[in-house]
Amino acid sequence: MTVLTIYREDLPEQPLTQTTDAAEIAALLAQQGLRFERWPAQVELADDATPEQILAAYATEVDRVKTEGGYITVDAVSLRPDHPDRAALRQKFLAEHIHSEDEVRFFVAGQGLFSLHLGDHVYALLCTQNDWISVPAGTRHWFDMGSQPYFTALRFFNNPRRLGRSVYRQRHRQSVPAPALNSGSERDNFILSLALAC
């Protein structure tokens, strides 16, 4: 289930807002210049579906987003719990960073947690299957895929070489309990890291 939780950066243990309503999530994110949509499931895809099969299944939505946003390249990526570099990849994306182009993702399967550092607040969005999010260039954020990552996502790029520049900055973090990342079966709970003031 998709969940948006909003915290003050200095009081992560006291959520100001928490909602699972897709329309409310979209409205709250739109107030901050972000876009969120729920796309209808087109077909049931196998866990080992190829990037070509995934792109074909969502061709209508992909074409619409490419046209609206001027995106040139779209690809599909998957990460599973047995990936040998999952711990290193998780640590890399837990560092707060910005991109020189929009970060646009659609979750075909599984889930992941985007934490968006907007002013003195953090918007923690647990994205699940059929969620689409567009994070504007220059937005401070980090991504937690959990200790046992399971997701497949479409990625949209303005740059045909998919080389959007990332700037990573380490920030102090405080661990706060958060919803468990799972893929339909029970998974171990993970700890959501929220940025605190430097």
From Swiss-Prot:
Q: Reaction catalysed?
A: 1,2-dihydroxy-5-(methylsulfanyl)pent-1-en-3-one + O2 = 3-(methylsulfanyl)propanoate + CO + formate + 2 H(+); 1,2-dihydroxy-5-(methylsulfanyl)pent-1-en-3-one + O2 = 4-methylsulfanyl-2-oxobutanoate + formate + 2 H(+)
**Which controlled-vocabulary keywords does the entry list?**
Amino-acid biosynthesis, Dioxygenase, Iron, Metal-binding, Methionine biosynthesis, Nickel, Oxidoreductase
This protein's source sits in the domain of life called Bacteria
Q: What class of enzyme is it?
A: oxidoreductase
Tell me which EC number(s) this protein carries.
Answer: 1.13.11.54, 1.13.11.53
Subunit structure, per the record? Monomer.
Protein name, as recorded: Acireductone dioxygenase
Q: Which organism is it from?
A: Synechococcus elongatus (strain ATCC 33912 / PCC 7942 / FACHB-805) (Anacystis nidulans R2)
Organism classification: Bacteria, Bacillati, Cyanobacteriota, Cyanophyceae, Synechococcales
